[in-house]
Amino acid sequence: MRYLALCTDYDGTLATDGRVLPETESALERLLASGRRLVLVTGRELDDLQKVCPRLDLFEYVVAENGALLYQPSTDEETPLAPPPPEAFVTLLRQRGVGPISVGRVIVATWEPHESTVLATIRDLGLELQVIFNKGAVMILPAGVNKATGLASALEKMELSPHNAVGIGDAENDHALLALCECSAAVANALPTLKGAADLVTAGDHGAGVVELIEELLRDDLASLEPRLERHNVLLGTDDQGNEIHIRPHGETLLVVGADGAGKSELATGLMEKLAAASYSFCVIDVEGDYGTVAKAVSLGSPSRPPTANEILKLLRGAGQSAVVNLSGLPASDRRPFLMDLTPKLAELRARSGRPHWVVVDETHDLLPANEASGELLPLGDGESVLHITERPNLVTREVLRATSLFIALGASAQTLLDEFCQVSGLERPVTRFAPPKKGEALAWRPASPNARPVRLNIAAPQHGRAAAGAASGVGKTGIERPARARTGPLH
């Protein structure tokens, strides 16, 4: 299951005239029964929300005051995410005739046309506050506070990634909410600008639109929407015509093959850095200890001390964390048993939290060899993403070959490796019309794409080279990349 949480606005989205209709409430209950979770993200103050929405218990967290207050209904615990408004500011607004005015734990709210007076008061007092509009409402908050920052705090407490969340809204203040979530939806009554930014616009308005989205989630986990989510695709490089070659961040199985020194680890490192830059997490099964300094990942284990499954899982549960599992300290005979123990635990973590988003298996032929049944060892779940790295296709189990969505061969023997992949997989060999790839290039082919031909992939150089064994890098987080799209190549 890819989408583990639905994050919804209240007024104008979940609610009609301030109230949630029974059919909408019933859909929320069905979503919870599927194992998914709910977060309410609203500009309302909590006291007011509790008066109009008696079923806050359906939500694991409520992000109130437009991202400034976190509330957990199950414990009745409130956590302000920013300081309260200055008393002098509220007093001066009232003296200047601003009203009605409400003051929450953090937020100050009024209505148009008082925005000019509000801005003048902020300027006169020299305050670092921002003004956010919401269909006539004027909300004043500390700089940098919005629905996305509040939701990020809630998801972190839930041990979920925004990449496993769906957001839905209707108004100006929902832009940040929708931008944070992997998949964004706008109800039919939403503002045109929000509809233009959303991945999906529902046919129904208000709560009916939320019900529609829930039904799609329950039907196929929004798999039918996948072709529209190009904004999350990760750039691998370009072809000879300058077309960008991308991979999807979800549901891909890459097989990278080539001799030692052909550039397999450089390609893998570059891909992992791009995934990390977009806040996708990964777990590298590093047989020889080659990936210890991959950016924004923590190396666990060393040549003198193998890692434990518990420390791997503990690290990966953290928001934005990626792990390099160094198995060089294990005897070769113990590596497959280690993976047999780790694989179901990784699968359980993925089912619960969505992380790690990618599993990278180096030296796949050592762990998943061709001469042994390896189905129970495949670090695959339903639609999960895996990168396999090996020397030759005929060295790995056929389960890996059958699952491959993108085949990449490096080095002077790339076309021979493609022939071997097709022969072992029982596929017709595609026609290639270019010379063997040079250093920094690869042959790339999508075997399941109709009429797809192999292309020469010009690989973007990674920021860091092949790692020294046993080193650990710092851990960091960045925002979700949403780059402008260039021309798309045939492997997209």
What positions do the PLM features span?
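Walker B catalytic acidic pair
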Residues: 10, 287, 362-364
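P-loop NTPase catalytic phosphate-binding loop
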Residues: 230-358, 368-387, 391-395, 399-403, ...
